[in-house]
Each structure stands twice: as structure tokens, then as C-alpha cells.
UniProtKB/Swiss-Prot annotation:
Name the UniProt record assigns to this protein: Putative uncharacterized protein DDB_G0293418
Low complexity bias: start-end ranges: 8-32
Domain of life: Eukaryota
Region annotation Disordered: where it falls in the sequence: 1-64
């Protein structure tokens, strides 16, 4: 009886605090995080993926 009554308020407060704290930084970081990941992904994913694909699967993925 106390569980259902304590779960809604607790869950609501926890989600609201997490959502509220995660929304402002996420929104502000969105434009700032998009450029870095793209550069990091392009520079670190292309060579890494190419080397891993070439050494791990040369016949299946020659030069995709």
C-alpha cells in the first residue's frame, strides 16, 4: 500500500531532476559535441575501421 504511493513521487522527482539536469547541458552541449565527435569519428573511425577491416576481413571487405 505504501509502495505504490511512494513510487510515483520518488520516481517523478528522480526523473525530473535527471531530465532537468540532463536537458540543459545536453542542449548546450549538442552543438558543441556534434563537431568534436564528427572530427573524432572521421579521423579515428576511418583509419581504425580500415585497418581493422583490412586485417580482419580483407576478402569480405576489400575497400568499402
Amino acid at each position: 500500500m505504501n509502495n505504490p504511493n511512494i513510487v510515483p513521487p520518488h520516481f517523478n522527482q528522480h526523473q525530473q531532476q535527471n531530465h532537468n539536469q540532463n536537458q540543459p547541458p545536453h542542449h548546450m552541449n549538442n552543438p558543441n559535441i556534434i563537431p568534436p565527435p564528427q572530427r573524432f569519428n572521421n579521423s579515428n573511425v576511418v583509419p581504425h575501421f580500415n585497418q581493422l577491416s583490412n586485417q580482419n576481413q580483407p576478402p569480405q571487405r576489400p575497400q568499402y
